[in-house]
């Protein structure tokens, strides 16, 4: 399970050090993909394969489903952390998420999100006030 907030730095080569507590879960390979809110999502390979299989079952005649699948597949990069637990984020991913040197990695239960630190701060300021109301609306009786 991926939980918590971490603040690694992006180096000049586009490498980001993953939090040590997640490295074992990601050692077998991981998938970095574009996510909502101009962040990046990092999935263990097996978890991403399940997501991709579910997405590929959507009707190919539905233009929204085709667009989602195209964006998912085209915007995904397979990575294997190096001995120091670093992954290299592509220039396209760094641009998409507007990543600067200061990044935030957050646990999102079954995957990680990578944010630019300022973008994450802005997101939190905008959405934190609505957290209680949003959780009631979005999750209903689940929690």
From Swiss-Prot:
Keyword Protease appears in the UniProt entry: no
InterPro entries tied to this protein: MraZ (IPR003444), MraZ_C (IPR035644), MraZ_dom (IPR020603), MraZ_N (IPR035642), MraZ_sf (IPR038619), SpoVT-AbrB_dom (IPR007159), SpoVT-AbrB_sf (IPR037914)
CC annotations in GO: cytoplasm; nucleoid
The UniProt record lists the keyword Transcription: yes
Cellular localisation: Cytoplasm, Nucleoid
BP-aspect Gene Ontology terms: negative regulation of DNA-templated transcription initiation
Record's keyword terms, sorted: Cytoplasm, DNA-binding, Repeat, Transcription, Transcription regulation
Top-level taxonomic group: Bacteria
Gene Ontology molecular function: DNA-binding transcription factor activity; transcription cis-regulatory region binding
Domain SpoVT-AbrB positions: 5-47, 76-119
SUPFAM superfamilies registered for this protein in UniProt: AbrB/MazE/MraZ-like (SSF89447)
Pfam families named among the record's database cross-references: MraZ (PF02381)
Matches recorded under HAMAP family: MraZ (MF_01008)
Subunit structure: Forms oligomers.
Family: Belongs to the MraZ family.
Name of the molecule in the record: Transcriptional regulator MraZ
Organism of derivation: Mycolicibacterium paratuberculosis (strain ATCC BAA-968 / K-10)
């Amino acid at each position: 399970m991926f939980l918590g907030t971490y603040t690694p730095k992006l180096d000049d080569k586009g490498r980001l050090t993953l939090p040590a507590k997640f490295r074992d879960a990601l050692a077998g390979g991981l998938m970095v993909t574009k996510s909502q809110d101009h962040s990046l999502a990092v999935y263990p390979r097996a978890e991403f394969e399940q997501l991709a299989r579910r997405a590929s079952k959507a009707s190919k005649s539905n233009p929204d489903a085709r667009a989602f699948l195209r964006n998912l597949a085209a915007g995904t990069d397979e990575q294997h952390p190096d001995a120091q637990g670093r992954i290299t984020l592509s220039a396209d991913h760094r641009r998409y998420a507007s990543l600067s040197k200061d990044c935030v990695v957050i646990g999102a239960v079954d995957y990680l999100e990578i944010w630019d630190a300022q973008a994450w701060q802005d997101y939190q300021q905008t959405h934190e006030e609505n957290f209680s109301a949003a959780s009631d609306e979005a999750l209903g009786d689940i929690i």
